[in-house]
Regions:
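Short, glycine-/Ser/Thr-/acidic-enriched flexible segments
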Residues: 22-24, 35-37, 51, 216-217, ...
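Glycine-rich phosphate/diphosphate-binding loop of Rossmann-like nucleotide-binding domains
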Residues: 167-282
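Rossmann-fold NAD(P) dinucleotide-binding segment
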Residues: 275-287, 293-299
C-alpha cells in the first residue's frame, strides 16, 4: 500500500497550466492530476507564498477524495500566489478565470477555496467570462450531456449552491442567510466523523474535538459536530486560539461562527497564537479536524 501511494504521489500530473499576470505580481497554476472519466475537479485558492508544488499536492488529494466518494473523475486544483487582502484581488481573479476559461468550459470544474468565495467571487466572475457555472466542465466532460440536458442540469446547479438555508437545524442563524455553498463542505466533514463513530465507537456524542482553522470548513464542521453532541474543546487559527477542556456549548459555538470576520476567529477570550499553539496539543481529545491552509501549523 505504501509503495502504491508513493507511486501515486510521484507520478507527474497529466496537465499543468501556468499563468503570470501582466498587471500585478500574481501567478497561478491549474494542476489536473488526471482526466479520469473525462473531467477533473478542484477549487480555487489564493494566498501569498503558494507555489506549484502545493497545488500539485492538493490536486492529488482531490483525486483520492473523488475515488472514495465520487464522482469517478480526476483530481485538480487551482492556486494563485497573491495577497488576498490586496484591493486588486477582483481584477486578478477576473484575468485568471478569463485565462482558464477553455478548461472550465470542457473538462475542469472549480469552486471556492481558501480566500476565494464561491458565491461572491467564483460564480459571478466565471459567468462574466462566459462560463455557465464553475462545474460546467465536469458536467460536459464527464456526463457528456445533450444541449437540453446541459441547460437543465446546470440551471439546477446555479440555483442549488446559492440557495439560502431555511431550515434552522442546518444554520446557526436564519437572519444571516447562510447558503448551501457556505455550509456544505463543513457539513460533509461532520457527517463523515459522525458516521465513523456511529459504525465503530458507539456514537459520536461526548467525543472531544480540536479544530484547526475557522473558515467556512472549520466553522461549519464545528457547528454540526457540536449539534451531534460532540464537545469542541479547542479551536486554533492564525489569529490565536480558544481552549475549554469541558467543551464549548452550542450557543458559544454558534456565536463564534456568527462573529467570524471572513476566515478570522474572533472572540474577546482569544489566546495569542503562540500560547494557544503550545497548550492546545496537551488537551484530551479524540478528533482533530485539519481545516486550515496547507502546512500552516506544525504539530
Amino acid at each position: 500500500m505504501k509503495e502504491l501511494l508513493e507511486k501515486f504521489e510521484n507520478k507527474r500530473p497529466e496537465i499543468v497550466f501556468e499563468w503570470k499576470d501582466t498587471e500585478t505580481p500574481a501567478e497561478g497554476w491549474v494542476v489536473i492530476n488526471s482526466l479520469r472519466g473525462g473531467a477533473a475537479g478542484g477549487g480555487t485558492r489564493m494566498r501569498m507564498g503558494l507555489d506549484k508544488r502545493e497545488v500539485e499536492s492538493l490536486a492529488k488529494t482531490m483525486e483520492v477524495k473523488f475515488t472514495v466518494s465520487g464522482p469517478p473523475i480526476g483530481g485538480a486544483k487551482s492556486g494563485i500566489n497573491f495577497d488576498p487582502n490586496d484591493p486588486r484581488k477582483a481584477e486578478v481573479l477576473h484575468r485568471w478565470y478569463a485565462a482558464v476559461m477553455p478548461l472550465l468550459k470542457y473538462y475542469y470544474g472549480t469552486g471556492g477555496d481558501l480566500n476565494v468565495d464561491e458565491i461572491h467571487e467564483v460564480i459571478p466572475i466565471t459567468e462574466d467570462v462566459g462560463i455557465w457555472h464553475p462545474q460546467e466542465g465536469v458536467f460536459t466532460g464527464h456526463y457528456k450531456p445533450s444541449e437540453p440536458q446541459k441547460v437543465n442540469r446546470i440551471g439546477q446547479l446555479r440555483q442549488g449552491v446559492v440557495k439560502v438555508i431555511e431550515d434552522p437545524r442546518f444554520t446557526p442563524s436564519l437572519e444571516k442567510k447562510y447558503t448551501i455553498a457556505d455550509m456544505c463542505t463543513g457539513y460533509g466533514v461532520a457527517q463523515a466523523v459522525g458516521h465513523y463513530y456511529g459504525l465503530w465507537h458507539n456514537g459520536a456524542k461526548g467525543k472531544r474535538v480540536v479544530l484547526q482553522g475557522w473558515g467556512n470548513v472549520g466553522a461549519a464542521a464545528g457547528f454540526y459536530l457540536s449539534q451531534m453532541g460532540m464537545k469542541v474543546v479547542g479551536i486554533i487559527s492564525k489569529e490565536g486560539g480558544l481552549i475549554n477542556q469541558a467543551g464549548f456549548g452550542q450557543e458559544e459555538i454558534n456565536r463564534l461562527v456568527l462573529d467570524r470576520q471572513g476566515n478570522k476567529l474572533v472572540s474577546p477570550d482569544l489566546l495569542p497564537f503562540e500560547i494557544a499553539n503550545e497548550k492546545i496539543w496537551d488537551l484530551e481529545f479524540e478528533v482533530f479536524i485539519p481545516a486550515a491552509a496547507s502546512a500552516t501549523f506544525l504539530l
